[in-house]
Amino acid sequence: MAEGVFQGAIGIDLGTTYSCVATYESSVEIIANEQGNRVTPSFVAFTPQERLIGDAAKNQAALNPRNTVFDAKRLIGRRFDDESVQKDMKTWPFKVIDVDGNPVIEVQYLEETKTFSPQEISAMVLTKMKEIAEAKIGKKVEKAVITVPAYFNDAQRQATKDAGAISGLNVLRIINEPTAAAIAYGLGAGKSEKERHVLIFDLGGGTFDVSLLHIAGGVYTVKSTSGNTHLGGQDFDTNLLEHFKAEFKKKTGLDISDDARALRRLRTAAERAKRTLSSVTQTTVEVDSLFDGEDFESSLTRARFEDLNAALFKSTLEPVEQVLKDAKISKSQIDEVVLVGGSTRIPKVQKLLSDFFDGKQLEKSINPDEAVAYGAAVQGAILTGQSTSDETKDLLLLDVAPLSLGVGMQGDIFGIVVPRNTTVPTIKRRTFTTVSDNQTTVQFPVYQGERVNCKENTLLGEFDLKNIPMMPAGEPVLEAIFEVDANGILKVTAVEKSTGKSSNITISNAVGRLSSEEIEKMVNQAEEFKAADEAFAKKHEARQRLESYVASIEQTVTDPVLSSKLKRGSKSKIEAALSDALAALQIEDPSADELRKAEVGLKRVVTKAMSSR
């Protein structure tokens, strides 16, 4: 890689199933990986020798299911006892354990048991995306804009930001996926000038968002947002997988539920069938020797696929209704409905949405897999002063807080301070008081959600305001100040008005939140793993070079015509050097240096023997 640092910031769409990276240098470019693919699987695999990320990891998943990790986005920022985590664990082949209430992934790597947080796995995928960009740009990349589902809560946003830090990136901004896609749509279609209401329907591999935006004169204002952080293509695959499992059991009497390899192979076949059914109405699914020597063969119609997922498909309309209601806009006022995310290719999803909007033509002008990274790259260029076009220089993004933020009051009642769909950044205040006489400490539990009962919302963290002057109950004036930044991340301060005493948190003791020491430790570990990957690659290369050189010299020595060109008496020296080289290849775990030395030694002897007689 050439020296120098890229002055801009790359845009990364960190997806549940696939990730995508884009850069902006006078225009947006989606960058293909070394396989030539413009999206890279969000997979990390661990083997006794090395770590694989992306296509290489996904391609060996069936052979190494227990140590191939995916879906980290479904774990990030969640508690171990989260209902969705517990449900997902039943379908994942890798092991998730509870460490202090947080989910941690356990794998075998370099013949040891290792544990990784979801942030660390996500950081590995981010590092891969960063390297893909660096290979194209030819410079070191330090800054990025990373996207998250609009419906991600504070803990999930902060954990994603932490993943960026672990990967060595300076995350300039966390932006919402549908908002990023809206930029791609507005710029790509040259439609950012004309005033319009646009609904972004973003159904990906693992998450679902709907955002309603008002676009006018380069100003993108999010009016409302809704979604489900646990709905996407993976769930449609799971329903197909269950259907095929039952069919296989009915035909053969065999249950593959506990066989990770068979499940992975059948899931891959289910995913392939799902994709095929977007363009044809019937497909055949075949998996040779799926389990116990029995083959699996089945035919699947599009109608059956739609039937198996009918409830999930129908549920995608609920957030659409919600955003219209929240923005107080009727469906007839929506100018465009824009499809984003690979799962919007499913014909039934498109039909339900079009029917909801009374037969409206859906907008498919942007690439559903690439739009989010495209928008993130534009935002990265704006934040680093690299955007040069007239279209982007006046572009302004006004996003919203997806869920209400507030504090727990007496009786576990949720006191909202920042209502959902408030434009961010924002500062909101609310006053509280004491509930008993001479109370000197008040605890502020901070929640995010929409339920009246605090227990049904997400606890983000808590802190105490101490040394309140002794007064009768209800007299002290305590002000809670909520600041939400442009990343959607919250800082809370509480002030006792008569003394000015204050206490604040950036929700530091929250769910899955890493301390700066933990992040630093993970950054160092990430560097070590990268160094180990590089050392393994060098060793592999050195071994291949030596093996191929040894093979060519063996051919020379045994070929009567070629060996006749050797100096007299040198054949035995070459044979001795060959046996040294072969011995180096037999060593249990030779270093790249040892293999290189063996190659140089053999070359020296051969060169002398070949020089003019």
From Swiss-Prot:
The modification Phosphothreonine is found at T47, T431. Pfam families: HSP70. GO terms for molecular function: ATP binding; ATP hydrolysis activity; ATP-dependent protein folding chaperone; heat shock protein binding; protein folding chaperone; unfolded protein binding. One of its GO terms (cellular component) is cytoplasmic stress granule. The modification N-acetylalanine is found at A2. Keywords: Acetylation, ATP-binding, Chaperone, Cytoplasm, Hydrolase, Nucleotide-binding, Phosphoprotein, Protein biosynthesis. ATP binds at residues 16-18, 73, 205-207, 271-278, 342. A motif (Nuclear export signal) lies at residues 574-582. Residues 403-613 are annotated as: Substrate binding domain (SBD). Residues 392-402 are annotated as: Inter-domain linker. Its EC number is 3.6.4.10. Residues 601-613 are annotated as: Required for interaction with ribosomes. PROSITE patterns: HSP70_1 (PS00297), HSP70_2 (PS00329), HSP70_3 (PS01036). The keyword Nucleotide-binding applies. It is found in: Cytoplasm. One of its GO terms (biological process) is cellular response to glucose starvation. It catalyses: ATP + H2O = ADP + phosphate + H(+). The keyword NADP does not apply. Its main location: cytoplasm. Residues 516-612 are annotated as: Lid domain (SBDalpha). Belongs to the heat shock protein 70 family. Ssb-type Hsp70 subfamily. Ribosome-bound, Hsp70-type chaperone that assists in the cotranslational folding of newly synthesized proteins in the cytosol. Stimulates folding by interacting with nascent chains, binding to short, largely hydrophobic sequences exposed by unfolded proteins, thereby stabilizing longer, more slowly translated, and aggregation-prone nascent polypeptides and domains that cannot fold stably until fully synthesized. The Hsp70-protein substrate interaction depends on ATP-binding and on allosteric regulation between the NBD and the SBD. Binds to ribosomes. Binds close to the ribosomal tunnel exit via contacts with both ribosomal proteins RPL35, RPL39 and RPL19, and rRNA. Directly interacts with nascent polypeptides. This interaction is dependent on the ribosome-associated complex (RAC). Interacts with SSE1. Present with 104000 molecules/cell in log phase SD medium. This is Ribosome-associated molecular chaperone SSB2. It comes from Saccharomyces cerevisiae (strain ATCC 204508 / S288c). The lineage of its organism: Eukaryota, Fungi, Dikarya, Ascomycota, Saccharomycotina.
